[in-house]
């Protein structure tokens, strides 16, 4: 059984091998995000009995400067929101539950002035959140439509949320997030591509596969297509 950080350590070890073994794992904690994406059962007894047999699914892996990540590299606001939003609140209010909890974090949000270089473009702006992922959900929240995410297409989903201004700006941004209006450049920069470079005036604290990834002023991220294979018990 592995948590996110443990699988990240395993991925970093496996990527150094010339002959890479197929990987089977039993998800714990935040790894349910990636497990849902690859349709891996969360029934621990079933997985333990069948961990070495099943369908084989190739998966992309990301490089983060000189290390690797499995499904997400992220920074900024809202990263704790999905974890602290109770199931009771979500059952009662649906997506609005995230909005209710997110409001509590507004006074803790810090913008970062960064330059994004991707797809031959360079964009400099203030952003409160950034995520480079290979998963339908990050932090328990589905940021992207299910049909738009494939774990072995050679591309990552890259979402950056621009700094809102005032309570009205934050409200509109949160609703744009909830209803996945990612192509609206008033609120977001959104890419589906295989590489990106991010530069900041000050070091940004990154989260890599759910674990602290250090403070970085410059980050280069790229996609290694179908780098490893997962075993999915059926």
PLM ranges: what are they?
Residues 1-4, 28:
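Glycine-rich beta-strand-to-loop/alpha-helix junction loops that act as flexible
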Residues 3-4, 40, 74, 163:
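Short beta->alpha junction loops/turns
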Residues 6-10:
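Short glycine/serine/threonine-rich phosphate/pyrophosphate-binding segments
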Residues 12-132:
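Catalytic core of DAGKc-family lipid kinases
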Residues 67-74, 79-80, 124-134, 138-139, ...:
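Short hydrophobic-aromatic micro-motifs
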Residues 89-96, 142, 146-165:
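Gly/Ser/Thr-rich active-site loops/lids in small-molecule metabolic enzymes
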Residues 110-112, 126-128, 152-157, 194:
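A generic structural signal for short beta-strands and their flanking turns/coil linkers
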Residues 118-119, 124, 150, 160-234:
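ATP/nucleoside-binding phosphotransfer catalytic cores, i.e., glycine-rich phosphate-binding loops
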């Amino acid at each position: 059984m592995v948590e996110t950080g443990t699988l990240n350590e395993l991925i970093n070890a496996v990527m150094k091998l010339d002959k890479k073994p197929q990987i089977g794992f039993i998800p714990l904690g935040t790894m349910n995000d990636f497990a849902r994406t690859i349709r891996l059962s969360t029934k621990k007894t079933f997985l333990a009995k069948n961990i070495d047999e099943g369908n084989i699914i190739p998966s992309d892996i990301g490089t983060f400067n000189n290390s690797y990540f499995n499904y997400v590299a992220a920074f900024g606001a809202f990263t704790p929101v999905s974890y602290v939003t109770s199931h009771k609140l979500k059952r009662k209010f649906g997506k609005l539950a995230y909005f209710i909890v997110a409001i509590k974090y507004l006074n803790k949000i810090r913008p970062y002035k960064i330059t994004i270089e991707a797809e031959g473009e360079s964009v400099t702006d203030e952003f409160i959140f950034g995520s480079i992922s290979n998963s339908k959900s990050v932090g328990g929240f589905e940021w992207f439509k299910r049909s738009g995410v494939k774990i072995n297409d050679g591309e990552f989903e890259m979402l950056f949320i621009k700094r809102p201004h005032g309570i009205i700006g934050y409200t509109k941004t949160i609703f744009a997030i909830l209803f996945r209006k990612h192509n609206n450049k008033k609120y977001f920069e959104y890419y589906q591509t295989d590489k990106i470079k991010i530069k900041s005036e000050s070091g940004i604290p990154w989260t890599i596969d759910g674990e602290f990834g250090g403070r970085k002023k410059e980050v280069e991220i790229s996609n290694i297509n179908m780098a490893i294979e997962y075993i999915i018990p059926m």
